Curated annotation (Swiss-Prot):
HAMAP family the record matches: RNase_P (MF_00227)
Family designation: Belongs to the RnpA family.
Species whose genome carries this gene: Beutenbergia cavernae (strain ATCC BAA-8 / DSM 12333 / CCUG 43141 / JCM 11478 / NBRC 16432 / NCIMB 13614 / HKI 0122)
Protein name in the entry: Ribonuclease P protein component
Role description: RNaseP catalyzes the removal of the 5'-leader sequence from pre-tRNA to produce the mature 5'-terminus. It can also cleave other RNA substrates such as 4.5S RNA. The protein component plays an auxiliary but essential role in vivo by binding to the 5'-leader sequence and broadening the substrate specificity of the ribozyme.
């Protein structure tokens, strides 16, 4: 489970990330990122709309994305806000595909404090 200190919950954090941040996307997802005070821990949020599928499918996608980010939140720079927005093709994606997409987006945004070796 993603630690409570690393979860984004407030709508103003989501709005700030979407408005002021940068983004990188793939066929399955878009990663939005913004920075805040360096003293704060990195925080992550997820957006999975009804366009992705029904409730069961959306929750499965969210679980997979949370699992991917749970292991990467320690690699993020302090003060980073990250929102992962799932697109409809993510409904049929495997965990490995989502992992590759998230890793590629985080790396291209330059958000990692340390690089995780590819599997």
């Amino acid at each position: 489970m993603l630690p409570a200190a690393n979860r984004m919950r407030r709508s103003d954090e989501f709005a700030r990330t979407f408005r002021r941040g940068t983004r990188r996307g793939t066929r399955r997802l878009v990663v939005h990122a913004a920075t805040t005070d360096a003293g704060e821990p990195p925080r992550v949020g997820f957006v999975v709309s009804k366009a992705v599928g029904g409730a069961v499918v959306r929750n499965r996608v969210k679980r997979r994305l949370r699992a991917v980010l749970m292991h990467r939140v320690t690699d993020l720079l302090p003060g980073t806000l990250v929102v992962v927005r799932a697109l409809p093709p993510s409904a049929n994606a495997t965990s490995a595909e989502l992992e590759r997409d998230v890793d590629g987006s985080l790396t291209s945004l330059g958000l990692r404090a340390k690089v995780v070796p590819a599997r």
